[in-house]
Amino acid sequence: MFQDKYVFSQLTAFLNRTQFNNYVRKYGGNRYVKHFTCWNQMLAMMFGQLSNRESLRDLIVAFEAHRAKQYHLGLGREPIAKTTLATANRNRDYRIFEEFAFYMMKEACEKRTTNILDISGKKYAFDSTTIPLCLATFPWAKFRNKKGGVKAHVLYDIEAQVPAFYTVTTASKHDSTLLSSIHYEPNTYYIFDRAYDSFKELYKIHLTDSFFVVRAKTNLKYKTVQWKRRMPKNIMTDAEVKLTGYLSEKKYPESFRLVRYYDEEDDREFTFLTNAKQLSALDIANLYKKRWLIELFFKWLKQHLKIKKFWGTTENAVRIQISVAIITYCLVAIVQHDMKLKRSTYEVLQILSISLTDKTHLRDLFDKTNFNDVKDLNNPLIPGLFD
């Protein structure tokens, strides 16, 4: 199947082009297009993500260097000019790429789901990361008086270790207001940092027969209804409580659980609120610990978007670039699963970054490459991102 094909072409063969074309037709993406199609555009952006291009100009230089290989890489027959890619990113509907990203996330989640904790039900972490932008160049992304930025809000499947949902807003949008964008599923655990203690939304989770685990703010006002006297090591408090603030009590009128946990490794105390009364206090603490997986995802996302210049300055172009980054991330996760690779994701990404235009079978590439040869490409990623 992959004989005499470039590594990049073998990789993109895992993409569902039929499904992508459905979104292209839905939004008229290829209307009046003669050469550089939406498919070519997405692959060009993915090539830039995987090869760590620093700017649009840097990406075009790479295409010029591989001009003879361009068609077989899936990038079309015509030379790709800087203005061609910039215009496509500015004018083509970002929803084509966003909806394909949702499709890729669903496929990756379904394939990669495992039970990393002995707790039934899906487990998600929800958080955001801010990507700073120059206000003079991106005036639509105003954050503060002299700053600009966008936020990527992500619902992250901590068992499949891929995003399950995301949305992009300006950085001025408060995190807790995005809770209403989540479609809550029954018998599912949602893990939040303390920026998300909107009791109205937490009660909504409770009423859908799902569960939340959220860090409590230090100024929380509550009364203890009942507490446990015997607790395991490092559990300092395990109590049933009710809110006492007038507005808070109206937003969450029932009692819930408060767990105070001491982390020996960091010498810190954490206070969690949850409606999961069926779990042990240690299970609650261990669930919250899995939040670090979404932080690793944000490190990857920021590294691949932390470039000298975005490949377009409009909101549409920025949304396309973020969507393509997530598509690329999910593609690597799917390839890793389907090929049953024993490599860590860190190794897979690094090997791909220096091998995209090689004619080596993917299996041979990952089986035979000595990772010591690519250690000089070291970055802040922690090995085992999907493992």
Model features per residue range: what roles?
Residues L73, R112-T113, W140-F143, E201:
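Catalytic micro-motifs at enzyme active sites that drive phosphoryl/nucleotidyl and oxygen chemistry
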Residues Q70-L73, D358:
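Juxtamembrane membrane-interface segments at transmembrane alpha-helix termini
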